[in-house]
């Protein structure tokens, strides 16, 4: 759905973003999406966040030759400091600062390792320190932390044109707002739904546009 009616988010990104976009990606995982951004937008600047050792090292090895990528070993969160990551095997990509609930039964094959302390940074603080004054798109895949990160960084979010976010259709992690509540929260801060991609019963992705920019 959505006014752009595109079936491929990557095609949409190429057509809609400027040649030199500022991109924030949280949940970099192995860096494959980051590398795509860096290749497609050599004049842009991509800031990526991945807090866990194994995926961070994989992403670093994939991305260290891109001059337009800044990779930070942090999780985004409401407050800067230490956080507890509920860690699973890296291949599952399901680790979260949120305690897993429904995902334990919905995805029983995921191997959960335990709790790991990670560094957490508030996005507004990061952008202030790094002189980031506007963002063309945020690309958020954070296993339930997306809403909290957005709501806790109102300054840079208000200066962000698009947010592409993972969303929950059922509770997979503790305390995560489900799709309709999430969309309501986004509408309150000036973002409307452009496009929904909801192929699974548990989670999907939604593209939001800041109607004030």
Model-derived segments and their meaning:
Residues 1-213:
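Phosphate/nucleotide-binding beta-alpha loop and adjacent structural elements of enzyme active sites
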């Amino acid at each position: 759905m959505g006014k752009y009616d595109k079936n491929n988010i990557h095609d949409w990104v190429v057509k809609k973003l400027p040649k030199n976009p500022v991109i924030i990606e949280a949940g970099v995982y192995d860096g494959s999406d980051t590398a795509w951004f860096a290749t497609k937008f050599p004049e842009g600047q991509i800031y990526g966040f991945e807090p866990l050792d194994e995926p961070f090292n994989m992403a670093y090895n994939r991305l260290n030759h891109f001059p337009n990528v800044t990779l930070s070993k942090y999780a985004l969160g409401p407050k800067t400091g230490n956080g507890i990551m509920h860690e699973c095997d890296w291949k599952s990509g399901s680790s979260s600062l949120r305690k897993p609930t429904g995902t334990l039964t919905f995805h029983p094959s995921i191997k959960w390792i335990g709790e790991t302390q990670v560094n957490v940074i508030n996005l507004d603080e990061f952008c202030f320190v790094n002189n980031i004054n506007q963002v063309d798109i945020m690309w958020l895949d954070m296993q339930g932390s997306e809403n909290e990160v957005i709501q806790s960084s109102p300054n840079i979010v208000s200066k962000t044109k698009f947010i592409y976010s993972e969303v929950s259709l059922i509770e997979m992690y503790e305390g995560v707002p489900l799709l309709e509540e999430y969309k309501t929260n986004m509408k309150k801060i000036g973002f409307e739904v452009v496009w929904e991609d909801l192929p699974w019963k548990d989670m999907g992705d939604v593209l939001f546009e800041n109607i004030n920019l």
